[in-house]
Amino acid sequence: MAVTASMVKELREATGAGMMDCKKALAETDGNMEEAIEFLRKKGMAGADKKAGRTAAEGVIAIAVSDDKKKAAIVEVNCETDFVAKGDDFKAFADEIAAIVLATGTVDVDALMNEKMANGQTIDEKRREMIGKIGENMAVRRVELVESNGTIGKYQHGEKIGVVVAMNGGDDALVRDVAMHVAAANPSAISADDVDQEMLEKERKFQIEQAQDSGKPAEIIEKMIDGRMRKYLQEITLLGQAFVKDPDQTVEKLLKASDASVSNFVRLEVGEGIEIEETNFADEVAAAAAAVKG
């Protein structure tokens, strides 16, 4: 039986599945609507698109490192609740995605969704299946691949913060210590030379406004601004920060003592930058009542 647009529309409305999934289901079941619905249910596709608009700000950070420690993949996979994020199935899903990124080098999220998992499903098919099974929206949000001519180390604070550091020189213990420091101190850049100029200009403008309010002479104000900017750069750069395990020395001194240097780092924290719409209880009750009436 030929699959028509109206049949696809009817199936989408009944299941909330995507257009292409509905078309495939109808083709597989020779246009039988009930069998197509069951096909989608078994595949976990029903309802996935309906849940796609819901905010997924919980989740995990997963990291995969190559055996030679020359390459690492770090990914953020989101869900809606911490309860689901702590589940073994969800963590295994995220871990396999990180392993796929490491193996394929695919860092574009849309392209990554089409990569195959060990069971033959694409990542997106597995994601939809899990949405149907668990009932929460899920998304692969961020993907990074880090490579090094030296060595790579990682550090994870639970599953909520993950760090990958590329280092030249030093040993495994040092690169892990630096990764742990990045997790705790959250530097914006490696050194002052790497800091975004727009960020610097914004901070300098703020410091100028603050200093001018002091009413001090111009030459004193200039020195105040220079001093505050030096302190600011120390606070936001990896090399300028005091090492978390030994605040008496900077990370720069720690690295120099081992003739080591950091060429790159990536720090991901679950949910950072995601805006969560806050709804009070009264609003939730009103919305639920309206839905029942509708």
UniProtKB/Swiss-Prot annotation:
Membrane-spanning intervals of the chain: none
GO molecular function: translation elongation factor activity
Main location: cytoplasm
Subcellular locations according to the entry: Cytoplasm
Keyword Hydrolase attached: no
Pfam hit, one: EF_TS
PROSITE patterns found in the cross-reference section: EF_TS_1 (PS01126), EF_TS_2 (PS01127)
InterPro entries membership: EF-Ts_dimer_sf, Transl_elong_EFTs/EF1B, Transl_elong_EFTs/EF1B_dimer, Transl_elong_Ts_CS, UBA-like_sf
GO CC terms of this entry: cytoplasm
Matching CDD domains: UBA_EF-Ts
Role this protein plays: Associates with the EF-Tu.GDP complex and induces the exchange of GDP to GTP. It remains bound to the aminoacyl-tRNA.EF-Tu.GTP complex up to the GTP hydrolysis stage on the ribosome.
NCBIfam families linked to this entry: tsf
PANTHER family for this protein: ELONGATION FACTOR TS, ELONGATION FACTOR TS, MITOCHONDRIAL
Official protein name in the record: Elongation factor Ts
Origin species: Hydrogenovibrio crunogenus (strain DSM 25203 / XCL-2) (Thiomicrospira crunogena)
